[in-house]
């Protein structure tokens, strides 16, 4: 059994979150006003320069559109879903999977070919990644930033990406009170939402259709190089659920190393706010391997 056929798509999707970092770079959205005050004494002349920054207030229309987008994201505490995952390429591969989430706490992905036997498991708790390879009895236990080329990531951002929800890095899921933190542009009937504060080295934005259904997430490195990749996620099949709008189909294109990678996720159903079990235990007879072995574990051997 080739684990690459089943688990690598999930790893690729997590890698979307390479945009998440610890250093913010503000996009110019402000006006600077400089005032100078001069104080003179018999011996000393002091000049003090003070710079104040004023953020441009969002328009009424922008506030309205952002509120409609944000209000489409309903509240939830837990999630269980079935589905399938496939990799594009010369030989498309697919597998059934089960997904469980506890909001803001954990993600559990069980890879089950034919929907029967679990061959691999990926668990993220907080900012820690656990990958269990059941066929070869080995595991990886590392920081979740292993999936994002060393850039910090947390489980909440991953959950938003999996469900097709806009977010502002460092502030969480987009809500109606965040209109002043984003810019909104109507481009040929498509609403583009772009956080004013971008993270160092990357830029990201979200696009929604006229019904406020998410269409895409784009994460682009500021400086193009072989060490960083552009991540694009296309969403479709948006449906209304107990937790608001949810994209049931997710299609991602990126790179793993220098190799192009495409991914399709198709959710078959959602169950909300019921008790879920997240198994993050490591079997006692399994061998730990280093994070640098990640792609080697899930190779085509």
What are these regions (language model features)?
Residues 16-19:
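C-terminal motif of bacterial Sec signal peptides marking the signal peptidase cleavage site
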Residues 5, 22-26, 174-287:
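Gly/Pro-enriched, hydrophobic low-complexity segments
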Residues 1-8:
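Bacterial N-terminal signal peptides that target proteins for export
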Residues 106-160:
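An acidic-aromatic
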Residues 144, 148-183:
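C-terminal low-complexity, charged extensions that often adopt amphipathic alpha-helices
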